[in-house]
Amino acid sequence: MEYSDSGITFLLMAGGKGTRFGDQEKCMRDIDGNSILGNLIDSLTPLSHFITVSTTLKHGKTIEFCRSRNIPTIITEGIDYTDDLWHSIVKINKVPIIVMGSDTYITDLGHFRSVIASMNNSEIPIVDILQNNIFSGISLFNRIPGKGEILEYHELNSEKNFSLNINTLEDLNRLKLILSQKTAGHFQ
């Protein structure tokens, strides 16, 4: 059967405290005239019609942005990432779900798509995606976990980078530099 990624659900986690960045709504920071979250949603839209953002009531800009783009939003307590993740997955109640931070910038959509395709029909409950042996912050859930349940997981390594997590201002500045080099024709 030919692979189709249109049935995959993307869950974008946007309820963090933004401690290292100094801004709890870092996903709303501008990158190339669009927010980080807006860029991520624009990148994922060709891959799936099922994109949901999980956030908290403390993230008003994020909630309003999602409302303006008709992106379904799950409101969590924002106290514990694991609880927020579990609550969100249970609320969606559909697998497979690809979970990623709302502060992710996809740098190579074609390669990202091929990584997703390589996991098609995996029977492993969770697949954590690595880039050059470093966790990318992206995981595929093939099963909805029970509350507090620890699921078996597997790591899939991509030897080619396809995304960048924007965790600090330095990461944001590095991405802006990468994008300016790409625009100037110097990107390799």
PLM segments and residue spans:
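Conserved core of the sugar-phosphate nucleotidyltransferase
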Residues: Y105-Q188
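Hydrophobic packing residues within well-ordered alpha-helices of enzyme cores
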Residues: F21, T62-C66, V115, L175
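Short acidic donor-binding/metal-coordinating loop in glycosyltransferase active sites
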Residues: S102
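Short glycine-enriched, charge-decorated loop/helix-capping segments at active-site entrances
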Residues: E25-D30
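Conserved N-terminal catalytic core of the sugar/cofactor nucleotidyltransferase
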Residues: E2-Y3, I36-V99, G110
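N-terminal nucleotide-binding beta1-loop-alpha1 segment
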Residues: M1-Q24
